[in-house]
UniProtKB/Swiss-Prot annotation:
Family listed: Belongs to the heat shock protein 70 family.
Classification lineage: Bacteria, Pseudomonadati, Pseudomonadota, Betaproteobacteria, Burkholderiales
Stated name of the protein: Chaperone protein HscA homolog
GO BP terms in the entry: iron-sulfur cluster assembly
Listed Gene3D superfamilies: 1.20.1270.10, 3.30.420.40, Actin, Chain A, domain 4 (3.90.640.10), Substrate Binding Domain Of DNAk, Chain A, domain 1 (2.60.34.10)
Pfam families: HSP70
The protein's role, per its UniProt record: Chaperone involved in the maturation of iron-sulfur cluster-containing proteins. Has a low intrinsic ATPase activity which is markedly stimulated by HscB.
Gene: hscA
């Protein structure tokens, strides 16, 4: 199948000049780096032949670091200084981390992002991630014996702007040139699309160590389009470990009293979870300060106690299908991504719900890195004639505030990115020289129920009558999901802009709540919107009529003026009520009642414009 070729700005025009570009899966539990070598994407191993790098960093005395397997080996004995799953903290504040009491770290709530106190000082998730990225960068450079041109780094589909920017910052600290951030499910689709050449509608079910993503993708004629996305940025294999650990401690009547105990129980729980993927029973043994934890765990027990977690993933699948307005029968195949999908209960639940066995052709641990490597190979200009078009989507609608506290959507939810859209707005009052721009994210019709992203002002608008100025507001979302908003007054050219980089992340429960409320309150929201719009139109009409009376009231007889003023009062009184139709009727009555007055004003304006001018000048 011939795929559409896309050339990126700055791409080398020389087809023989090969640049070393890699794909990096910066995962919660482990990370990988892959590259295309001799036309085949492959994960790059370390000196001992291991392709997986545990996402763990241990901080030692004197500024030394232990990274990956070395850090993981000391996790139980030195949990406070061994940071794992740092990806879960990217772009987050302390209040965003619901399970912090279960974690052994000494959290520090610094402005902008939570940090962890270690023996080597306070470390941010960005710094921890940078250590992992630098290790993978050195591995790739050693493998090719050359410097890297750049990297495509994957992120969960539900990472918001703050989390994506934090990932870019970590890459910069690691000395990496980021060619693009792409969603993990999309990277998996790239790998499977190229390997199998299959077209159709696919569900990508990605359950990693700390995040869950479900995406619906349409593969057709070389185009990967993400139709809809969903998920939970704080649900993954780690939560299965915590559930098993809590259950085991409660059953034994013991408590994890120290950080070492907490970490040791979690390590043992993970080992049991992995063993139960191939065995019907496994033994959990941990020496704690309070005593010996020793019990047998069956697969049936484990699946029963973690069923609520599995059900949460299926609820997200249902939501994505509803968003895309497709039935389960239309899904051609299911792609499993993430090591946690090796659990038999996951494969059984997905098969039962979607009615088809998932694709498992590629290693679920490696598939994301392989797809990222293929994309990096193309963006570096190394691929010849077989590039593909990649379309990600915005997870929530983007818009701005208008009069009456209403939200005007500019970019709807699930719009393919990169994208740019613009809309014209105007002034509300005569002589208005500034306009406040309030950028919002969410699915509700009212400002108070949406998330505020940014505020800025456009100043220097030429004074005009209300409605005469034309302000074009442009929204642009780049390939990394970052938003830029520009407001420009068309006649004067004055302009203001903002790039949205929120200082904190959007918690997973907030995302779920915003989407659910947008769905369940849609009918009521539309009624409220109609009422607010009617009130805004009343205010606009009354203001315009008052201004007209002040300027040209001498055109009216006393009785005519009194009639118009009575209609104005009636409209204002009606606007205090809750009946949008009645308000609209009052505004229409005011418009009808001022129609002859408007005609007289127009005639006066024409006479004034033509006064003293000859026919040939007109």
């Amino acid at each position: 199948m011939a795929l559409l070729q896309i050339s990126e700005p700055g791409q080398s025009p020389d087809p023989h000049q090969r640049r070393i570009a890699v794909g990096i899966d910066l995962g919660t539990t482990h990370s990988l780096v892959a590259a295309v070598r001799s036309g085949v994407a492959e994960c790059l191993p370390d000196d001992e032949g291991r392709v997986i790098l545990p996402s763990a960093v241990r901080y030692l005395e004197g500024g030394r670091r232990a990274i990956g397997f070395d850090a993981l080996a000391a996790q139980a004995e030195d949990p406070e200084n061994t940071i794992v799953s740092a990806k879960r903290f990217m772009g987050r504040t302390l209040t965003d981390i619901d399970d912090r009491e279960k974690l052994p770290y000494r959290f520090v709530d610094q402005p902008g992002m939570v940090s962890v106190a270690t023996r080597d000082g306070v470390k941010t998730p960005v710094e921890v991630s940078a250590e992992l990225l630098a290790t993978l960068r050195f591995r790739a450079e050693d493998s090719f014996d050359d410097e890297l041109f750049g990297a495509v780094i994957t992120v969960p589909a539900y990472f918001d702007d703050a989390q994506r920017q934090a990932t870019k910052d970590a890459a910069q600290l690691a000395g990496l040139n980021v060619l693009r951030l792409i969603n993990e499910p999309t990277a998996a689709a790239i790998a499977y699309g190229l390997e199998n050449g299959s077209e159709g509608l696919y569900a990508v079910y990605d359950l990693g160590g700390g995040t869950f993503d479900i995406s619906l993708l349409r593969l057709s004629e070389g185009v990967f389009e993400v139709v809809a996305t969903g998920g939970d940025s704080a649900l993954g294999g780690d939560d299965y470990d915590h559930a098993l650990a809590d259950w085991a401690l409660a059953g034994a009547g013991l408590a994890a009293e120290t950080a070492q105990d907490k970490r040791a129980v979690l390590v043992a729980a993970r080992a049991v979870k992995e063993a139960l993927s191939s065995a019907a029973e496994a033994r959990m043994q941990v020496v704690l300060r309070a005593g010996l934890l020793d019990l047998a765990v069956t697969r049936v027990q484990f699946e029963a106690l973690t069923k609520p977690l599995t059900d949460r993933t299926l609820a997200a699948v249902r939501k994505v299908l509803r968003d895309a307005k497709v039935s389960k029968d239309e899904v051609k195949g299911v792609v499993l991504v993430g090591g946690s999908t090796r659990m038999p209960q996951i494969r059984e639940a997905v098969t039962l719900y979607l009615g088809r066995s998932p694709l498992t052709d590629l290693n679920p641990d490696e598939v994301v890195a392989l797809g990222a490597a293929i994309q990096a190979h193309q963006l570096a200009g190394n691929a010849s004639g077989n590039d593909l078009l990649l379309l990600d989507v915005t997870p929530l609608s983007l818009g701005l505030e208008t009069m009456g506290g209403l939200v005007e959507r500019i970019i709807p939810r699930n719009s393919s990115i990169p994208t740019a859209r613009a809309q014209d707005f105007t002034t509300f009052k005569d002589g208005q020289t500034a306009m406040a721009i309030h950028v919002l994210q969410g699915e509700r019709e009212q400002v108070e129920y949406c998330r505020s992203l940014a505020r800025f002002e456009l100043r220097g608008i030429p004074p005009m009558v209300a409605g005469a100025a034309r302000i074009r507001v442009s929204f642009q979302v780049d390939a990394d999901g970052l938003l830029s908003v520009t407001a420009r007054e068309q006649t004067s050219g004055v302009e203001a802009a903002v790039t949205v980089k929120p200082s904190y992340g959007l918690a997973d429960e907030q995302i779920a709540r915003m989407l659910q409320e947008g769905f369940t309150t849609a009918e009521g929201d539309m009624r409220d919107r109609a009422l607010r719009e009617a009130r805004v139109e009343t205010e606009r009409m009354v203001l315009a009529t008052r201004a007209a009376l002040a300027a040209d009231g001498d055109l009216l007889a006393d009785g005519e003026r009194a009639g118009i003023e009575a209609l104005m009062r009636a409209a204002e009184q009606q606007a205090l009520g809750e009946d949008a139709a009645a308000i609209d009727a009052a505004v229409k009555a005011l418009a009808d009642g001022t129609e002859s007055f408007a005609a007289e004003r127009m005639n006066r304006g024409i006479r004034q414009a033509l006064a003293g001018r000859r026919v040939e000048e007109v």
